[in-house]
Design a protein with these regions (language model features):
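Membrane-embedded alpha-helical bundles of multi-pass transporters/translocases
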Residues: 1-175
Length: 175
């Protein structure tokens, strides 16, 4: 939903010769900040979230396992959301291959993790749970370097609360 609001605004800035880099940087930083807080809250609230979604697990080992796996993997939402924003930047410049490779990278990492876990006799569930955030980091690094090659080096920082960023939040906020 955020990207559905971001991409048209970003594309308009690119076409109009406006400060597209500044807008992208502010959107990246703002999204990263909000999602970092959201990820921390979600991780801390994981027992409640598991209970709300799988109350049948309460009172047995599945509950604790679901909480553990949820806490490990919840940060993926931060990484994949930033990947989506960077993919929107790339798509605006007609660079579709990089963004379309992101899910392939996830599949490759999961296959590699399962093979490694089987060979090393690791716990498969924990291996796959840890593969989720590691995959998010790899996907973010891949799209970040792709955007950098396109001339967009977006580093987290304090976003400037410009009228455009406020408009973006108003449009994307309800979703």
């Amino acid at each position: 939903a955020f990207n559905m609001a971001f991409v048209p605004m970003f594309a308009k800035k690119v076409e109009g010769g406006e400060d597209a880099k500044g807008f992208a940087r502010d959107a990246f930083s703002g999204l990263a900040g909000v999602l970092l807080i959201f990820s921390l809250i979600g991780t801390l609230a994981m027992p409640w979230l598991v209970w709300a979604m799988a109350s049948g697990f309460a009172g047995d080992a599945r509950f604790d396992l679901a909480v553990l796996f949820g806490r490990i993997s919840f940060s993926y939402i931060l990484f994949i959301s930033l990947v989506a924003l960077l993919s929107g930047v790339l798509n605006t410049f007609g660079r579709f291959t990089e963004a379309s490779f992101v899910p392939v990278l996830m599949n490759l990492m999961f296959i590699a993790a399962m093979l490694l876990a089987a060979r090393a006799d690791w716990d498969m569930g924990l291996t796959l749970a840890w593969t989720v955030p590691l995959t998010g980091i790899a996907q973010l690094a891949f799209t970040w370097f792709s955007a950098r090659r396109q001339g967009f080096t977006l580093l987290p920082g304090w976003p400037r609360w410009t009228p455009d960023l406020k408009r973006l939040l108003i449009i994307a906020g309800p979703a």
